[in-house]
Every structure is written in structure tokens, then in C-alpha cells.
Regions:
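Electrostatic, structured charged patches in enzyme active sites and in nucleic-acid/phosphate-binding
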Residues: 1-139
Length: 139
């Protein structure tokens, strides 16, 4: 994948299914870079927003209740069907994080539109705090 550092490992849902550190409803992909940065990726190209937000709630609950093997929880990434779905998700996520009192960077959540991965841009990812700006997965 051109947006990842060389030497990064990408694991599918089937590969991570045997590990206990992941949420019960496993993400579709798990990414680990050579320098130890991590991300879990959820593909939701055909789901309504309320289902996507429920999935996010499950991951946030897992991050708070069970945590991760090391101190920092992986980046939480959602790939959505188009830009409209991405912006709706990011807006709803911003409101959720704000109501929870989470600080910027405390639980990194990013979203991308599926079609963005085919475009010649630096990165397809955006954050709830700056939905119109693109940011690298691992800054």
C-alpha cells in the first residue's frame, strides 16, 4: 500500500482472529509499521451511519475497558463508501468525542472515502477535528 512506510505488515481479519487483544467484533485489517505504530481498519462501504457509529462505539469501549498490550491504542480507521459518508461519519464522531471529553490525539480516529485511494493525493485520511484536510495515517 503506497500510503504506508516500507516494511509495514498488514494482517487480514482471518489472521488477527486468533489474537485476544482486538475487540470482539474484529476489524477488517490490522497494520503495524516497522517502528511499532499500529492501526486497525474497518471497511464499511455499504452500511448506514448508525451501524458505523455503533461499530465505533464498540471500539471506543474496548479501548477504555480492555486497552491494548502497550500503552497507546492503535489508530482507529474507517473506510467509507464516498466523501459524503466520510464527512457525516467525521461530524458525528467529532460530536461523540466532544461529549466524552476526549482530548485531541488521545484516541486517534481517521476516516477515508474508498475512492480516495485511487487518487494521487498525499494521504486519503481525515480526522474528526479537521474533516476537510488530509492527514497521514502515521504522522
Amino acid at each position: 500500500m503506497k500510503y504506508l512506510p516500507d516494511g509495514s505488515d498488514i494482517f487480514s481479519k482471518a489472521e488477527i482472529n486468533r489474537f485476544q487483544q482486538f475487540p470482539k467484533n474484529r476489524p477488517d485489517l490490522y497494520i503495524r509499521t516497522p517502528d511499532g505504530k499500529e492501526a486497525i481498519v474497518v471497511l464499511v462501504d455499504d452500511k448506514p451511519l448508525y451501524i458505523i457509529l455503533k461499530r465505533l462505539d464498540e471500539i471506543i469501549t474496548h479501548s477504555e475497558d480492555e486497552g491494548w498490550d502497550n500503552d497507546s491504542y492503535p489508530h482507529i480507521c474507517f473506510i467509507l463508501k464516498d466523501h459524503a459518508a466520510k464527512y457525516s461519519f467525521l461530524y458525528a464522531t467529532y460530536k461523540k468525542l466532544e461529549s466524552m471529553g476526549l482530548e485531541e490525539g488521545e484516541l486517534p480516529i481517521l476516516a477515508a472515502a474508498l475512492g480516495s485511494f485511487d487518487k494521487p493525493i498525499i494521504s486519503p485520511w481525515s480526522s474528526p477535528l479537521k474533516p476537510k484536510e488530509y492527514t497521514k495515517l502515521f504522522a
